[in-house]
Amino acid sequence: MSQRPNPSALIWLLLSALVIGLDQWSKAWVLSSLPEYTSVPVIDGFWNWYRTYNTGAAFSFLSDAGGWQLWFFTALAMGISGLLAFWLSRTARGHWRSALPYALVIGGAIGNVIDRLMHGHVVDFIQWYIGSHTWPSFNIADSAIVGGAIGIAVFGLFDKAGKQAS
C-alpha cells in the first residue's frame, strides 16, 4: 500500500487571492472617492487617506528613472512570486509559518503588479504621521508584502533556533 503524499501548501494561494481582491477593491474605492494629493483625516494626528501615485518601489525608489522601472519591478515581483509559489508547492499544507508569509508576499506583489500594468504606477492612499513626521504613503499590497517579509525573517529565525536546539 503506497502512502498518500502530504498535501502541499498551495491552498494558501487563496489567501494571496484575498489580498489581491482587497487591495484592488480598496484602490478602486480610492480612485473613485478620494481627491488627489489631499489629506482626508481618519484619526487626527496619526492617519489620513491621501491619494498619491508611485512609479517606483518602496519609498518611491527609482520613481524618476524614466519608465524602465515599471518593467523591472513587474519582472522582479513576478519572479519572486513564482519562486514563492514554487516553495509553497514544496511546503506541507500545515506548515503555516512558511505558507502564511509566502502567501502574503505573493498577494501583495501581484496586487502592485496589476496597478503597474493597468495604470503605469501604484496607487497609494494610507498615510501615517505623528506631528510633522510623515511615513511614506502605502496601500494594502504594501502592507501584505511587509507583513510577509517580517514573517519570513522572524519564523525563519525561530525555525533555525529550534533545529539547532534539537
From Swiss-Prot:
User: Pathway involvement?
Assistant: Protein modification; lipoprotein biosynthesis (signal peptide cleavage)
What membrane topology is annotated for this entry?
Multi-pass membrane protein
Q: Which residues form the active site?
A: D124, D142
What GO molecular-function term can you cite, just one?
aspartic-type endopeptidase activity
Q: Name one GO biological process term.
A: proteolysis
What keywords tag this UniProt record? Aspartyl protease, Cell inner membrane, Cell membrane, Hydrolase, Membrane, Protease, Transmembrane, Transmembrane helix
Checking HAMAP family in the record gives: LspA
What is the protein name stated in its UniProt record? Lipoprotein signal peptidase
- Species of origin reads Xanthomonas oryzae pv. oryzae (strain KACC10331 / KXO85)
Question: What's the gene?
Answer: lspA
